[in-house]
């Protein structure tokens, strides 16, 4: 899907706040938290791994698409920390239990038909005390994103996230909303018990 529809990203991006503002908010939330071994789920071009990776001890960048992993490989080639690129699915992460310190899912969860299971799978690989950061959309009614951009979900509420986090043993520590267009970007940061 992503290789065939790359041109549509500009349309989606125009519906939300500038990505630079999202990145500033992400860095602000993670400012006092050491990423350790960082897992970037749905790495795409590797941008989030690059943004958060400077403070990491190691980066695992995971994506289903071999084409996206090739792009990420180029972007992350000069990383100051070891990077492993891995093909895999967010519903069945190819990592052992308690194996990573931080996980970021940036604009990924809305592709999940069962987001609760994706969060539970993230919790499985996250070490106790580790952080899960999900960046996605608040609830919206842009049905064309289902049709044109393969979104399985039209955003998430704080209540949904709080429930899914709690069911997976993750304490929701912080939420942030960034408005600036038809879509509101939300950041949910949790810590595994």
Task: Tell me the role of every PLM-derived stretch.
Residues 101-114:
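A short SAM/SAH-binding and catalytic strip from SAM-dependent methyltransferases
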Residues 4, 13, 17-19, 23, ...:
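Conserved catalytic loop of SAM-dependent methyltransferase domains
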Residues 131-188:
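C-terminal alpha-helical "lid/dimerization" subdomain adjacent to the S-adenosyl-L-methionine
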Residues 37-92:
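Class I SAM-dependent methyltransferase SAM/SAH-binding core
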Residues 1-7:
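N-terminal, positively charged/glycine-rich alpha-helical extensions of SAM-dependent methyltransferases
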Residues 116-131:
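A short glycine-rich, Lys/Arg-flanked "PGG" loop and its adjoining helix->strand segment in the class I
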Residues 16-37:
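Conserved alpha-helix/loop element of class I SAM-dependent methyltransferases that forms part
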Residues 91-103:
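A short acidic, Gly/Pro-enriched loop at the edge of an enzyme's catalytic core
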């Amino acid at each position: 899907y992503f290789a065939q529809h790359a041109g549509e990203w500009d349309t989606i991006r125009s519906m939300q706040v500038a990505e630079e503002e999202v990145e500033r908010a992400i860095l602000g939330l993670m400012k006092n938290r050491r990423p350790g071994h960082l897992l970037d789920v749905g790495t795409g071009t590797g941008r989030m791994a690059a943004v958060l990776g400077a403070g990491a001890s190691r980066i695992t960048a995971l994506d289903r698409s071999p084409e996206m992993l090739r792009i990420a490989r180029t972007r992350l080639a000069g990383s100051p920390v070891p990077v492993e690129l891995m093909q895999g699915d967010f519903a069945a992460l190819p990592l052992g239990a308690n194996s990573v310190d931080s996980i970021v899912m940036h604009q990924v969860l809305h592709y999940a038909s069962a987001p609760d299971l994706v969060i539970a799978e993230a919790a499985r690989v996250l070490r106790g005390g580790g952080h899960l950061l999900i960046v996605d959309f608040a609830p919206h009614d842009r049905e064309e994103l289902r049709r044109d951009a393969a979104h399985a979900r039209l955003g998430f509420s704080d209540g949904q996230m709080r429930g899914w986090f709690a069911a997976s043993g993750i304490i929701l520590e912080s939420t942030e909303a960034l408005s600036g267009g038809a879509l509101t970007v939300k950041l949910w940061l949790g810590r595994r018990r």
